[in-house]
A protein has these predicted regions:
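Patatin-like phospholipase
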Residues: 3-11, 16-107, 146-147
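Active-site gating loop/helix substructures
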Residues: 18, 89-92, 97, 125-225
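Extended, Lys/Arg-enriched charged tracts that mediate electrostatic binding to polyanionic substrates
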Residues: 105-122, 127-128
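Structural recognition of the beta-strand scaffold that forms the well-ordered cores
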Residues: 9-11, 41-44, 131-133, 207, ...
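Solvent-exposed alpha-helices and their adjacent loops that cap or buttress functional pockets
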Residues: 2, 121-126, 199-201, 231
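Non-catalytic peripheral regions of patatin-like phospholipases
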Residues: 60-107, 147-150, 198-361
Length: 361
């Protein structure tokens, strides 16, 4: 596909502050190649939603140009992430404001007060479309916040809602057991079905979980698996940036393990379907945190001489594994860890460009 014809969708996974930084590295590559201007749709989950929300907050509620991102926004975001322990701030808000109830709502308050994420979806630029993905406890479906839609098909949609960005982001990051649900009072809003007809909400309260429970990639607003795969109308090339941790060996019995196993299997199935779709159509990249260049070459069944050619240019196997093992947390990282994770996100898209050159000049 020619570069000038690209309508890029970004599906950005969850994974706490690690995911936020990894995705910033992906955006850095796009900016260096003047491709941010061709991003038409961003779909985000959990830590990725925090990343995108911070990006808008630090750029006057507009999506940055490639030049703005490189010269101003990325350095500003780095400083913010390094200097603010968001996890600590959220705990303080949970103790003093919510008495340890509604911890997801405490995250929203911390995002607003300490990261400066304020305003609602009507305040951000119309392009690209930004979909913040959550999971509805009541319906079991993916619940979406964006500039043009709030809701899910099973519960209904909010009409003319300028939903606060910080609250949508916090709902997207409300992991079960650890944080709990984000609660929405449905009564103040006017609800409608898909056709726009007015309906009454099915309950007075709606509870939203981390979008990763349903789809940790945030793929569904951009890519659907029906009919051998299809993109939404506003996208013809999708970059799936997966900064989630793979499931690992665990002998200790915990109730959260069933969530880990279920979400891991869902992610594997979604990844297989997406990879098959983009390989057939040459219209996307799948980036996986923790994979070094030689592993990408090997999995693609390419000549390993390609890996040897660049072995001194990219992060080592050990460095990539360090990124993969970085904990899922909202604590501020060290500058060394920030730079390492950022570089892995940046290099991951270069790996794919070298192995699968789907974008023509």
């Amino acid at each position: 596909m020619k570069k000038s014809e690209l309508k890029i969708g970004l599906a950005l996974s969850g994974g706490g502050i690690r995911a936020a930084i990894y995705h910033l590295g992906v955006l850095k590559y796009l900016a260096e190649n003047n491709l941010l201007e061709q991003v038409t749709h961003i779909s985000s989950v959990s830590g990725a939603s925090m990343c995108v929300g911070l990006l808008y907050a630090k750029n006057n509620m507009s999506f940055p140009t490639s030049n703005e991102y490189l010269t101003t926004i990325l350095p500003t975001l780095k400083e913010q992430i390094l200097n603010v322990n968001l996890e600590q701030k959220a705990i303080i808000e949970a103790i003093f404001k919510f008495k340890f109830n509604k911890k997801a709502n405490a995250i929203a308050l911390a995002l607003s007060k300490h990261w400066g994420i304020r305003g609602g979806f009507c305040d951000i630029s119309k392009k690209p479309l930004w979909s913040v993905v959550c999971t509805s406890y009541e319906t079991g479906k993916h619940f979406r916040f964006s500039q043009d839609i709030v809701g899910d098909w099973a519960f209904g949609y909010i009409k003319d809602s300028n939903f606060p960005l910080a609250d949508a982001i916090a709902a997207s990051a409300a992991f079960p057991f650890l944080i709990g649900t984000y609660e929405i009072d449905t009564k103040p809003f006017e609800w409608c079905d898909k056709s726009g007809a007015k309906i009454e909400p099915k309950s007075d309260k709606l509870h939203l979980w981390d979008g990763g429970v349903y789809d940790n990639f945030g793929l569904e607003p951009i890519y659907q698996m029906e009919n051998n795969g299809m993109y939404s109308d506003d996208v013809n090339f999708c970059i799936l940036s997966n900064a989630g941790k793979s499931i690992s060996f665990q002998s200790k019995k915990t109730i959260t393990r069933i969530v880990d196993v279920t979400t891991d299997q869902i992610s594997i199935l979604r990844a297989r379907a997406f990879r098959d779709f983009i390989f057939r159509n040459k219209n996307g990249y799948y980036l996986k945190m923790g994979r070094d260049f030689s592993e990408v070459v090997r999995r693609a069944k390419q000549d390993m001489s390609l890996a040897d050619k660049y072995k001194n240019d990219f992060l080592s196997v050990e460095e990539c594994q360090k990124v993969a093992n970085y904990p899922t947390t909202l604590k501020n990282p060290t500058e060394q860890d920030f730079d390492l994770i950022l570089r892995q996100g940046y290099e991951s898209i270069i790996y794919n460009k070298l192995v699968f050159d789907f974008i023509e000049p």
